[in-house]
Regions:
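Charged, solvent-exposed interaction patches on well-folded alpha/beta domains
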Residues: 2-166
Length: 166
């Protein structure tokens, strides 16, 4: 059963057995067409959404098994639990990956980005958020971390439904 991650059986002298069962933990949702499944950290489907209590999991949008494996590799480099819990969705775009955070911030990344760069990215993100700055995207695909702030000066001066006020 894919819900079982590990089983350990020990014989305790003279005639006792100790059985330890470690269950797989929900890691993320997998979107396949219009269906959503819960997967573990190695990409095995093991539950439907309504079967788990933790609903704060990222959505993986993978077109095929290779994309899923690559996305899981990207996610495995995000060690910070606060960062991971802020991920809304991750998907492959051409040969790179886009991570969408809960507040709409986009992180552009690649499969070769390591955990240290993700740590630095999250620290930068937190400092910008604490200064009430809005980030459009953070790009980790280059040697240095690049970012683009949202231009808050652009406001909708048009009518409520988008039409000019004439």
């Amino acid at each position: 059963d894919v819900r079982i991650k590990n089983i350990e059986i020990k014989k305790v002298y003279p005639s006792e057995l100790v059985v330890k069962i470690e269950e797989s933990k929900p890691y993320s949702y997998l979107r396949q067409g219009n269906n959503f499944y819960v997967i573990n950290d190695v990409g095995e489907i093991f539950a439907y959404i309504d079967e788990i209590s933790n609903k704060n999991l990222p959505i993986i949008d993978a077109a095929n098994k290779d994309d899923l494996e690559d996305i899981l590799q990207v996610l495995s480099n995000i060690k910070n639990e606060n960062f991971f819990s802020n991920i809304s969705e991750i998907k492959k775009v051409k040969s790179d990956y886009e991570i969408l955070l809960n507040d709409g911030t986009l992180i552009k990344t690649s499969i070769v980005v390591n955990h240290t760069k993700y740590e630095n990215c999250f620290k930068l993100y937190q400092s910008l958020i604490s200064e009430n700055k809005k980030v459009e995207y953070i790009d980790l695909r280059f040697k240095d971390i690049n970012l683009k702030e949202r231009d808050l000066s652009q406001t909708n001066l048009e009518g409520k439904d988008g039409r000019d006020l004439k």
